From Swiss-Prot:
GO terms for biological process: tRNA 5'-leader removal. InterPro entries: Ribosomal_Su5_D2-typ_SF, Ribsml_uS5_D2-typ_fold_subgr, RNase_P, RNase_P_CS. It is an enzyme of class 3 (hydrolase). It catalyses: Endonucleolytic cleavage of RNA, removing 5'-extranucleotides from tRNA precursor. The gene is rnpA. GO terms for cellular component: ribonuclease P complex. Belongs to the RnpA family. One of its GO terms (molecular function) is ribonuclease P activity. It comes from Streptococcus thermophilus (strain ATCC BAA-250 / LMG 18311). RNaseP catalyzes the removal of the 5'-leader sequence from pre-tRNA to produce the mature 5'-terminus. It can also cleave other RNA substrates such as 4.5S RNA. The protein component plays an auxiliary but essential role in vivo by binding to the 5'-leader sequence and broadening the substrate specificity of the ribozyme. PANTHER family: RIBONUCLEASE P PROTEIN COMPONENT. Its EC number is 3.1.26.5. Keywords: Endonuclease, Hydrolase, Nuclease, RNA-binding, tRNA processing. This is Ribonuclease P protein component. Pfam families: Ribonuclease_P.
Length: 111
């Protein structure tokens, strides 16, 4: 995923949490904020409660891969995906389907 597609700065995360709206399902929480950008930007958050560094990085890699696979269907907004407990045991297909579900609830996913 290119750097221009990532939310990295603390002020951007803070703006998303303060001014954005949130939706959730059992595996993910998504905060989103419309910024009128030419493409989407995403930030990933995986807590230490999910496991050691190897486990957290595996979850982040799978999330990034799923987001790039669905990039043509995503709205051009900033959003943060927070992984909840239990996502570390899911396969890529389950992560993809849960992510699509929560992004549809957030109205970030176009069919």
């Amino acid at each position: 995923m290119k750097k221009s597609y990532r939310v990295k700065k603390e002020k951007d995360f803070k703006a998303l949490f303060d001014a954005g709206h949130s939706v959730a399902n059992r595996k993910f929480v998504v905060y989103c904020l419309d910024r009128n950008l030419p493409h989407f930007r995403v930030g990933l958050s995986v807590s230490k409660h999910l496991g050691n560094a190897v486990t957290r990085n595996r979850v982040k890699r799978r999330l990034r891969h799923a987001l790039m696979d669905m990039s043509s269907q995503l709205e051009h907004q900033d959003f943060v995906v927070i992984a909840r407990k239990g996502v570390e045991d899911l396969s890529y297909q389950d992560i993809y389907s849960n992510l699509v579900h929560v992004l549809k609830i957030a109205k970030l996913y176009k069919d």
